[in-house]
Amino acid sequence: GITVYDLLKLSCQVSAKRLFPNFSFLDSPFNFQFYKEGDVNTEVGYMGCRTRVIGNSVDPDKAITPGRGNLSFTSINLPRLGIKHGMVNDNETNLDAFFEELGELMEFVKDQLLERFEIQCNRRIYNFPFLLGQGVWIDSEKLKPTDKLRKVLKHGTLTIGFIGLAECLKSLIGKHH
C-alpha cells in the first residue's frame, strides 16, 4: 500500500515540476504543540502567500485555523538590500549595515501593519457583509451590523514577508544555498 513517505516523495516530484511547494508537517515541534488528534480545526493552515495560521496569542483557547486569516502583509525586498550592502557593488560585504537596515525595515513594516490593523478594526460589520455577515470569522456571529471589527480581527494575523532570498545572498556574499 501507499505510505505517508510514498506520498511525500510523490508530492516532491509534483512540486519539482510545478515549482510551488507548500509542505506542512503537523508532527514538527513548531506545529505539533497546537495539534489535537482528531480535531481538524487544530491542523495548521497556510494561506496562498504561505502565511501560517494556527497559534493565537490573543486567545490560546482559539488557536485554530477556521474563522481566522491573514489581515495584511507586506514583503521586504531582500535583493535590494543585498545589492546595496553586498559585494556586487564594491567587492566588499557589509553584513553589519545589511542587518541594521533589515532591522529598521522590519520595524517600519511592523508599524505600517499595526496602523493598517487599526484602520481595519475601525470598520464595521456592514462594510463587509459577506465576510462578516455570514459568521465566517471567529465570534463574528455575535456582532451587530454597526459594531466595529476589533472583536473578530484580533484573531487574525499580520505578516512581514520577504522576497528574493537567493538573489539577496548572491549579491551580498557572492553565492546562495
Tell where the protein language model's regions lie, with residue ranges.
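Contiguous, well-ordered alpha-helical segments that form the cores/surfaces of helical PPI scaffolds
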Residues: 158-171
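Conserved catalytic cores of very large enzyme subunits
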Residues: 1-154, 175-177
